[in-house]
Amino acid sequence: PWRMLRITIFIRLIFEVIALQRISSVQPMRTPKTADFGFSFYAPYEAAVETAFLALCAARMQLEEESTPFAVRSMTFRLKSPASIRDKLTRRGLPQSAEGAAYLHDIAGLRVVLSSVEAVYRFADILRASPSWQFVCARDYIAVPKKSGYRSLHLVMLVPICRNGKSASVPVEIQLRTPAMDMWACVEHDLCYKPVKEA
């Protein structure tokens, strides 16, 4: 049974990696180009997301082999838009430039939805121990939720990449949460960040 389970998980991961490659291949066409946050600005973050996603796939296999099968419900990623970057830079009083954006750790983000709180923390332990990146910090909004009720475990990792023959480390934020937490986060985002349309 475990042999068949491993084969099933492996096939699922192959399809997810293929999907990631297809999305990544067209991402630059969907990324708005501005003076400071153009295609060249996003390139290192795209490379870091691809590397991080593969590391998540490996961690997923380890988690599902040692504990509950299909503990990982979904894995998604996104790159913060230029408008969102500018808004955050303004809130933090940072320069509206690539240099200012270097202080942000969530331009590249990945989200993993897991079946339970226990699976969230176990998955976090696996990620911290992975040689694919360097663990920077964690913000545990599960143990201490935000005032809005938002709950999630955020991990910041430095992902090594090689571009144009030069190596660099790019920060990536990984959000871990359960389906219920994910649903609440979506509701909160719609209420807090979407503009209200006048009738």
Indicate residue ranges for each PLM-predicted region.
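Alpha-helix boundary/capping motif
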Residues: 5-7
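Surface-exposed, low-hydrophobicity interaction/linker segments
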Residues: 44, 48-94
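Short, flexible, solvent-exposed loop/turn segments with mixed acidic/basic and small polar residues
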Residues: 94-104
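Long beta-strand-rich cores associated with HINT superfamily self-processing modules
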Residues: 101, 108, 113-199
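Amphipathic alpha-helical interface elements
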Residues: 36-44, 104, 113-118
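An acidic, glycine-/histidine-flanked metal-binding catalytic module
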Residues: 17-63, 167-199
